[in-house]
Amino acid sequence: RDLFVYLPGHGMARINTAEGRAGTRLLADTLRYNLGITTHHYVRINFEGFISAVDTLGGIDIMNERRIVDTCDLQPVEYPAGLQHLDGTSALCYARVRKTTSDFDRMRRQQQIIDAVFEKAVTLHGLASAPELYSSYAEYVDTDLTLDSVLQLLPLAFHVVNHPEDIHHYTIAHEHVQTHTVPDTGAMV
């Protein structure tokens, strides 16, 4: 979110400003230009939809590496080290906290949550009800995937669950970035 990168056709800026400037196409172009990542599709879910989806699944299980004490919506939260069962609201807070850890840790937690939601949906046969889920969550989700596209991706989803080694997560490590103060703002990125 705080990476200061080149936005094709827009100059240097924080990566999280790309979509707001020119939509998902600029964000995809920015990822490709700076990181070599080609984005084929996108899915964005709002907070209300995220909470509802996790609750519909009966919550998710997360292995928390270390104790986290922070705030979420101005309320104190604590996540002890070890296996945690999270409802939708707790999962959203777990994904968002970063004051007592770092933005890099937050990204790893978000990857954990995506994995846990995906795995739970597949093991509960949620993918079989993809058409119903697609329509019932439409108000919470922004995507360029049509229902037909989602249905065509279902065999891949089943494959991934049975072959988790085929999924690779990448996080930019601290040693691969430099701290920079944005001129005229004092913002550190």
Name each model-derived stretch.
Residues R1-V189:
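Non-catalytic, solvent-exposed segments at the cell envelope interface
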